[in-house]
């Protein structure tokens, strides 16, 4: 497979840098073709502003949706953004690798998403009608590709459990897994999460990561619900009462239960 890694850590000799090299090495040993976007090494521009739209009139108020849509349609985005979009089209599998800082990705990686997911590429696709509400959440430009996160954090696994003070790690990462990966069409694999990294053996983390890299073609994706498959009311995009099992609210509603997943496969 063709694998793209978006790597976001400022220090090559860090734990994340070492794990990144482990992932690349293992993927290449398995015969995959790997490209890397090392955002700090690239000195990636992390803010969206007028410079992203060279042809947008300087005397006109900047409307990001309009400017983004026009620049994408005219192929007049900046070269760094065009290059990253080309990498995404090239890849079969995409990995976002980053440390969890203040419960989310580093700003430089969020800036990559803000700039690369332009209108017409990452969003703004498909018809809006009484049957469909755009091509998103399971459909979109990146449909047919797989993605996953490699995440490191200092807290204990128990801190990010169902009763942990920080909330379940599935909930913490939901805005990224569901809102950034699933939204434009990726099938999203369960993340590799290294907890309590300052107290955990590197060899243990590296061994587990190597195993995950060997299994990327066979790992089952998180069974998120596709927006336009009939489980949500349109245009309110609320889940039908007949779905969701005993869950009354929350992120868990948007993942099919084991029973629902089995029913879908047998349908």
Curated annotation (Swiss-Prot):
Q: What is its EC number?
A: 1.10.-.-
Q: Where does substrate bind?
A: 122-124
> What metabolic or biological pathway is this protein involved in?
Secondary metabolite biosynthesis
Pfam families assigned: Flavodoxin_2
Q: Which Gene3D superfamilies match?
A: 3.40.50.360
Matches recorded under InterPro entries? Flavodoxin_fold (IPR003680), Flavoprotein-like_sf (IPR029039), NAD(P)H_dehydrogenase_qn (IPR051545)
What keywords were assigned to this record? FAD, Flavoprotein, NAD, NADP, Oxidoreductase
Q: Effect of gene disruption?
A: Completely abolishes the production of peniphenone D, penilactone D, penilactone A and penilactone B, as well as of crustosic acid and terrestric acid.
Q: Name one GO cellular component term.
A: cytosol
- The residues that the entry says bind FAD are 9, 15-16, 100-103, 152-155, 160
Q: Which GO terms describe its molecular function?
A: NAD(P)H dehydrogenase (quinone) activity
Quaternary structure note: Homodimer.
Q: Which family does it belong to?
A: Belongs to the NAD(P)H dehydrogenase (quinone) family.
Give the function comment from the record. Ribosyldihydronicotinamide dehydrogenase-like protein; part of the tra gene cluster that produces terrestric acid. The clavatol biosynthesis cluster cla and the terrestric acid cluster tra are both involved in the production of peniphenones and penilactones. The non-reducing PKS claF is responsible for the formation of clavatol from successive condensations of 3 malonyl-CoA units, presumably with a simple acetyl-CoA starter unit, and 2 methylation steps.
Give the protein name, as stated in the record.
Ribosyldihydronicotinamide dehydrogenase-like protein traD
Annotated gene? traD
